[in-house]
Curated annotation (Swiss-Prot):
Provenance organism: Ralstonia pickettii (strain 12J)
Family, as annotated: Belongs to the PurH family.
Enzyme Commission (EC) number: 2.1.2.3, 3.5.4.10
GO annotation terms (biological process): 'de novo' IMP biosynthetic process
Pathway(s) per entry: Purine metabolism; IMP biosynthesis via de novo pathway; 5-formamido-1-(5-phospho-D-ribosyl)imidazole-4-carboxamide from 5-amino-1-(5-phospho-D-ribosyl)imidazole-4-carboxamide (10-formyl THF route): step 1/1; Purine metabolism; IMP biosynthesis via de novo pathway; IMP from 5-formamido-1-(5-phospho-D-ribosyl)imidazole-4-carboxamide: step 1/1
Catalytic activity: (6R)-10-formyltetrahydrofolate + 5-amino-1-(5-phospho-beta-D-ribosyl)imidazole-4-carboxamide = 5-formamido-1-(5-phospho-D-ribosyl)imidazole-4-carboxamide + (6S)-5,6,7,8-tetrahydrofolate; IMP + H2O = 5-formamido-1-(5-phospho-D-ribosyl)imidazole-4-carboxamide
GO cellular component: cytosol
Gene Ontology molecular function terms on file: IMP cyclohydrolase activity; phosphoribosylaminoimidazolecarboxamide formyltransferase activity
Keyword annotations: Hydrolase, Multifunctional enzyme, Purine biosynthesis, Transferase
Name of the protein described by the UniProt record: Bifunctional purine biosynthesis protein PurH
Domain of life: Bacteria
SUPFAM superfamilies from the UniProt entry: Cytidine deaminase-like (SSF53927), Methylglyoxal synthase-like (SSF52335)
Classification via HAMAP family: PurH
Length: 524
């Protein structure tokens, strides 16, 4: 039974209401510093820990709760007579509920102006110590580190005469150890990222020891293949607009491949500014098989679908604008695995309600960029910054005698945006705000060019006057000749080959405009 609680929080969300509910249930309140002041100002009877222990806070608040009367009351096992006798001998009451969250270390070090001294002062000592003590003794002590759990604990106390059951206590204890591990990991990441110089003026983006924290969202029926097991974890620091922030409105449980493909679709469609019109991306096996922009979501979808209607079967479809009923009616005619948008009208929701197997995901648009991209290798982890660079007009360099027309320039920039999301080697034909042919994942660039041309022919789309993007340079003129033979009138590529002069001469020979971006977009 909970008779005495200690509350000491940095995040004071909901703490007054929770403390008042505890008081109304006859629970004695202990607290420290700012939390005690807030509770007292809220007319709640609270005892300062310094008064409770008879030992004042010292060292500018560094020592508040590190006292046997606190930790003895938390750690004593109620089922061991010798533990209870020791408490009695030293006049130590039990502490049955601990509510603690920690100094905001991660928020502090995220600030550009943060110094090492600032970071050190925000390393919590007493908080983690109490949390670990309470979590260790979870058979007898309820411990809360997350304000979201106040309601759960209070409801259980109200239903069971101030008692919280073992299952809830165990769940809360696991949450504590995950939280303190993450907290210590953040400290390690920060300290090992600092340079060895005494001023610590340099800080690496890649700490010597890298600690990552993820929460399990779901276990899956299987992984990439049926013989593989799998689960999906959410980054505790997932940025705004990340796929992991999805809300599933309907449909079957997402599979491993659904999530992988949905991420590719969502990242691609987010790269198109909704302020300039609707965009639609159709993904199959993590590659775009159709991308388009239009005045409406319906127009964008219909154009994207034309690129490769065969591959679009059972694909993942993403929009950068809310989906209305008109677009939903058209999309619903096809077999769709996953549908993603930042919102859905009531009419659109009603259309897909009749197709309950379709997984419908709502994700808010966001500009945030992940700190890292990861790739697992045998016995290690490759870590890099995300490929978030958008080429600026000032970085473009026309290298041919003929300059692209304004229409060609629009098509080139569209093609370049798409090529970034196509597996290397990538060749993308575009025109009129849509993809016309996509060549992906080939070992030679010329083969990707040939495949992209064939895909356009199969779809009945003309490549005359089209724009072509290549994610990396043309190593020889053969790739350029293939796309020009297919009908391309302009090309955008990074440049950087030892044979750039040969490729430029070939473009001039064929009266093709060509732009170098100076940026490569390999994707593996």
């Amino acid at each position: 039974m909970i008779q005495q609680a200690l509350l000491s929080v940095s995040d004071k969300t909901g703490i007054v209401d929770f403390a008042r509910a505890l008081h109304e249930r006859g629970v004695k309140l202990l607290s420290t510093g700012g939390t005690a002041k807030l509770l007292a100002e809220s007319s709640l009877p609270v005892t300062e820990v310094a008064d409770y222990t008879g030992f004042p806070e010292m060292l500018d608040g560094r020592v508040k709760t590190l006292h046997p009367k606190v930790h003895g009351g938390i750690l004593a096992r109620r089922d061991l007579p010798e533990h209870m006798a020791a408490l009695s001998e030293h006049s130590i009451p039990t502490i049955d509920l601990l509510v603690v969250n920690l100094y905001p270390f991660q928020q502090t070090v995220a600030k550009d102006e943060c110094s090492l001294a600032d970071a050190i002062e925000n390393i919590d000592i007493g908080g983690p110590t109490m949390l670990r003590s309470a979590a260790k003794n979870h058979r007898d002590v309820t411990v809360i580190v997350d304000p979201a759990d106040y309601a759960t604990v209070l409801a259980e106390m109200q239903a069971n005469n101030n008692t919280v059951g073992y299952e809830t206590n165990f769940m809360l204890a696991k949450k504590v150890f995950a939280h303190t591990a993450q907290y210590d990991g953040a400290i390690t990441n920060y300290l090992t990222s600092l340079g060895a110089d005494k001023s610590h003026s340099t800080r690496s983006a890649y700490p010597q020891t890298l600690n990552l924290a993820f929460d399990k969202v779901q276990e899956m029926r299987y992984g990439e293949n049926p013989h593989q097991s799998a689960a999906f974890y959410r980054d505790l620091k997932a940025v705004d607009g990340a796929l992991a922030n999805y809300k599933q409105l309907q449909g079957k449980e997402l599979s491993y491949n659904n999530i992988a493909d949905a991420d590719a679709a969502w990242e691609c469609v987010k790269s198109f500014d909704a302020a300039h019109g609707a965009a639609c991306v159709i993904i199959k096996h993590a590659n775009p098989c159709g991308v388009a922009i239009g005045g409406t979501a319906q127009e964008a979808y219909e154009k994207a679908f034309k690129t490769d209607s065969t591959s679009a079967f059972g694909g993942i479809i993403a929009f950068n604008v809310p989906l209305d009923e008109a677009a939903a009616q058209v999309v619903a005619k096809q077999f769709v695995e996953v549908l993603i948008a930042p919102g859905f009208s009531e009419g659109a929701r009603a259309v897909f309600a009749a197709k309950q197997n379709v997984r419908v995901l709502e994700i808010p648009l966001g500009k945030g960029v992940n700190a890292y991209d990861f790739k697992r290798v045998g016995g290690g982890l490759l870590v890099q910054s995300p490929d978030a660079k958008n080429v600026q007009p000032s970085e473009l360099r026309v290298v041919t005698k003929r300059h692209p027309t304004p229409k060609e320039m629009d098509d080139l920039m569209f093609a370049w945006r798409v090529a970034k999301f196509v597996k290397s080697n990538a060749i993308v034909f575009c025109g009129g705000g849509m993809t016309l042919g996509v060549g992906a994942g080939q070992m030679s660039r010329v083969d990707s060019a040939r495949i992209a041309s064939i895909k356009a022919q199969n779809a009945g789309l003309t490549l005359a006057g089209s724009a072509v993007a290549s994610d990396a340079f043309f190593p020889f003129r053969d790739g350029l000749d293939v796309v020009v033979d297919a009908g391309a009138s302009c090309v955008i590529q990074p440049g950087g080959s030892v044979r750039d002069d040969e490729v430029i001469a070939a473009a001039d020979e064929r009266n093709v405009a060509m732009i170098f971006t100076g940026t490569r977009h390999f994707r593996h």
